[in-house]
Amino acid sequence: MINNKNVIEMGLRRINQVIFSIFLLIGGCVAPPDYSDGLLENVPAIVDETDYFSLSLLGDDYSEDKEWELSLMTDSTDTILTTLVLADLSISNTDSSILFMMNDSGDTVFQPILLGNVVWSSDIAVNLIGSPKKISFKGDNFTGRLEYQILKK
């Protein structure tokens, strides 16, 4: 009778341990943050195709230099649509983030200094600036949203 009682107590302890472990595992789980726009903070999102390039950045004191070689295929008869949207910027006097677009000759053909909220777009003939080949972002405490696109028309 004593052995049966010990076996039952050991079984109940084992069941309690399993139940406690399950509650601990379920209760300890943390869901990932809910990003409504899909952007992760300080992680540039890039889409690079033969007819389209997009750079999206949600920066919070972002201070890195990044370069992207473009897959964009253009010839001298093409026109490109370039758009830049800057929003929710928080800039101090010492911040100096810059975006560059370089052509196939290595010349800088677009260089906005990112100082304030802006919505800008322009059609540019490739024969005037050369074929875009590289995008460079020099981040210096960039805080805000940057959306930059190049679309071959």
What are the residue ranges of the model-derived segments?
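C-terminal interaction-tip segments
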Residues: 80, 141-153
